[in-house]
Amino acid sequence: MRGFAAILERFLAVTTTLYVGMGAFAQWVTAPVTAPGVQYQTFQSAAAGQTVSFHVWLPSEYTSQPARVFPLLIWLHGSGDGTSGIPWLSAYFSTAMAQGVIPPMIILFPNGMPYSMWCDSRDGRVPMERVVIDDLLPFVDANYRTIGGRHRILEGFSMGGQGAGRLGFRRTDLFAGLSMLGAGPLQDDFLEAPLGSDISPVKRAMIYQNVWGNDAAYYTLQHPKTVITQQAAAVIGRRTVVRQALGSLDTLVPMNQDFDAFLTSLGVPHTLTVAPGIGHSASDLLPALGFGQWAFYNAALAEACRPLTDVDGSGVVDAGDVSLLLLDFGMTGSPADVDADGAVTGSDLAMLLLDFGTACDA
């Protein structure tokens, strides 16, 4: 009987979505947020076919050093209200920059709507990934003094943490670091709610319909596990700096530990930090990670500066890199797989020789 009841519960939850519209999901323009250093902007998105809003925070050096270019930190918000955290987050990172523990960065706060999961919806009505990657990032690069290249860190919390994983793994050419904070959903079946979840079955079913079209195959296709399985060689080869972090009281701990083990099984370098006594809250988690957490941002930006052909990480492309490449010739999962095609080949050697003598590209 329990099995039948579970099936019935799922059926009723899914069919409920037939009576729920897209109203809460399709909000391309938010109200402005007022906070020191924060700007509210809109742009025309080709993917969305309409105006889309975003917020951006600029460091004081953006005005005082008008010739300077800056790395970009992209923060992907969690589900629900995507703008309420902007004042706290901008102040938090501003303080760290003022203290000199991380370099000045531009912070981009995209509008991910309440429940987009930062994913292109199955029916095409909410092409969230394309809006962010294909439209918003080029717009920001064209209108703000960003360094470009891989001088970007992709970070997010909850829904945004899951999105940071999927988008960051998929586009290793755009991001040198990705940070999955309190990330979810990471379960293999979205309709299997984690213990303690505060998302009702009806809302969960509504999200499943509107984002993944009630299509288990599409959910799996867009799952970070699927993406990193396809992209492991590129993530490893490009030395993308990957971290997971969440609180010990977060209901998403088991699925994040499972994802940690999955990354380990693929040989993907990463870290997992579980902060004692912290629940599902970005404003509690980030301070709880302590001073040492700033090493993640600095490592990612240092990696962005390193030419991909600097295989040994010495800071310059030299004979040591040639030696390592030749030793790994034909191997998979090697940092010497510069073009991330899955193996160390002659094309990697050609790229290295073209870059011989090159140092940091910033």
Show the residue positions of the predicted features.
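Alpha-helical segments with a strong preference for the paired helices of cellulosomal dockerin domains
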Residues: 311-333, 341-361
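Low-complexity, Pro/Thr/Ser/Gly/Ala-rich linker/spacer regions in secreted
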Residues: 23-27, 298-310, 334, 359-362
